[in-house]
Amino acid sequence: MSQANAATKASSDVFFNASLEDIDPEIFGAIRNELGRQRHEIGLIASENIVSRAVLEAQGSILTNKYAEGYPGKRYYGGGQYVDVVEELAIERAKKLFGAEFANVQPNSGSQMNQAVFLALLQPGDTFMGLDLNSGGHLTHGSPVNMSGKWFNVVSYGVRKDDHLLDMDEVARLARENKPKLILAGGTAYSRIWDWKRFREIADEVGAYLMVDMAHIAGLVAGGQHPSPVPHAHVCTTTTHKSLRGPRGGMILTNDADIAKKINSAVFPGLQGGPLMHVIAGKAVAFAEALKPEFKLYAKNVVDNARALAEELKSHGLDIVSGGTDNHLMLVDLRPKNATGKRAEAALGRANITCNKNGIPFDPEKPFVTSGVRLGTPAGTTRGFGVAEFKEIGSLIAEVLDGLKVANSDEGNAAVEQAVKEKVIALTGRFPMYGYQG
């Protein structure tokens, strides 16, 4: 073997066999530190969850090497016979999980799945209705800073000021007045049950499509803890992470064959090129997990834990928007503690409790300050936390917020936060992740 060939072989051996720690210790270190953070912190961000080892293995597989533009059986590249199997499994499992006739599992994100529906069903300048961001909607539901608000004429509906529940009379009135081509139901910070049947009645009355973005509650729908929108909506979108407990990505469901064709064309070639086959493999694994009987128990526990957390926070003098929760999340009004969302998020973070500042309906504060925080129970429930643990977590949150109120400064109360941090580390240590103790 020549010296050149020997050098090439040695280089190949390193390329295929050296570990991440050997090749890139900086990235390895960041990942190791992030694992430590996740292990020792209580994650209450409602849009986050923890995937199984099986999902991690699928998403970290050699499927990342394969380009697969197109759909199973109709690829623009050769060598797709095995990724076809993966995508077909993901599609069939998604259809079974949600009782849908058609599923597209290729969207790379929640934003892209919603963009694909708009591309399929709307023209620039068309009118659609969506939940106002300040009432719990999402950027892609018509926010003026988002493509959805720039390309279309958006009519937003909201919640009532007295009880913070969806104002269905307002939805009906706005629909009759504006004759939208599409009505979008679903949100990111609404803690009550959605009346899909009523939304469909309104949509039918004005000749609109009904689109449901169930990204936050898809796992609860799959687990039987929230009514399914699939029988009512013309098209449903959902992310595959959040309460569904899969990899980060999106999915589109419909029972209408004509809409399915439009959706497929909108996703590819309209919006995306080659799908992320390693992510689709992770989706397929997560769907298989969600089809198991134990996932129904998980979904029930998510809701039970959320209700327990909300009641515990109320017992400590905090207000919960709409008075409580029927799903996995809640908005906490911090004004009784004279705190802002920005200050509370930082103080809780110092105590190893992760959440996000969030506007509340009719919030007087600026969007990057806010009067509230959003809390969710999917990740903690995945770790094994039950009602007792979430009651303890509610008490710890109140302890930090009371300390923040006494300190009356952005720096918070260091002594209180350190004491709570130690309790958090002790609690999380009883529920290890990925086989690691401590």
Curated annotation (Swiss-Prot):
The keyword Isomerase does not apply. GO terms for cellular component: cytosol. It comes from the Bacteria. Belongs to the SHMT family. Its EC number is 2.1.2.1. Catalyzes the reversible interconversion of serine and glycine with tetrahydrofolate (THF) serving as the one-carbon carrier. This reaction serves as the major source of one-carbon groups required for the biosynthesis of purines, thymidylate, methionine, and other important biomolecules. Also exhibits THF-independent aldolase activity toward beta-hydroxyamino acids, producing glycine and aldehydes, via a retro-aldol mechanism. It comes from Brucella suis (strain ATCC 23445 / NCTC 10510). The modification N6-(pyridoxal phosphate)lysine is found at residue 242. This is Serine hydroxymethyltransferase. PROSITE patterns: SHMT. One of its GO terms (biological process) is glycine biosynthetic process from serine. The record marks 241 as: Plays an important role in substrate specificity. Gene3D superfamilies: Aspartate Aminotransferase, domain 1, Type I PLP-dependent aspartate aminotransferase-like (Major domain). One of its GO terms (molecular function) is pyridoxal phosphate binding. It is found in: Cytoplasm. It is an enzyme of class 2 (transferase). Keywords: Amino-acid biosynthesis, Cytoplasm, One-carbon metabolism, Pyridoxal phosphate, Transferase. It catalyses: (6R)-5,10-methylene-5,6,7,8-tetrahydrofolate + glycine + H2O = (6S)-5,6,7,8-tetrahydrofolate + L-serine. Homodimer. Pathway: One-carbon metabolism; tetrahydrofolate interconversion; Amino-acid biosynthesis; glycine biosynthesis; glycine from L-serine: step 1/1. CDD domains: SHMT. The gene is glyA. (6S)-5,6,7,8-tetrahydrofolate binds at residues 133, 137-139. The lineage of its organism: Bacteria, Pseudomonadati, Pseudomonadota, Alphaproteobacteria, Hyphomicrobiales. Its cofactor is pyridoxal 5'-phosphate.
